[in-house]
Amino acid sequence: MQLHKIIFRYIICLTFGAAIITGLKLITSSIALWTKRSGQVMSGIYNFSDYAKYPLSIYNKATPIKYMLLFIIPFGLIMTLPTQYIIFGFCDIFPNVYILIVTICAMSLLFNFIGVKLFNLGLYCYESSGN
């Protein structure tokens, strides 16, 4: 495969991966509108990203952690799989790279939509924590 196509697809994955991270931050930060504190939730979610530093193939197919890293808190989807694609030229979970790209794009739209809706709902419940 031509190198410029691989790099272009990788840049698309990185761009929409950044959008997923933005949506995830918006979701976890919006919790503070109700609770006044969201630091523990945010750090818990981002500590979960340590599991995505390793290839997803080390996790058994039956483990829920693999699917959580792909679809619930998709750090594996945006960290491991695009890198695996650029290094090896294929991805073991998604047989076609276009399915991977469409999944990343759809997840970024979903997470940002949920984040914006949660933020707007939180604005109705917001009370200042000032003195």
Segments (PLM) and residue ranges:
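Alpha-helical transmembrane segments and their short interhelical loops
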Residues: 1-30, 34-35, 94-105, 110-112
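Aromatic-enriched hydrophobic runs in primary sequence
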Residues: 3-5, 18, 51, 82, ...
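Short amphipathic alpha-helical patches
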Residues: 51-58, 92, 109, 129
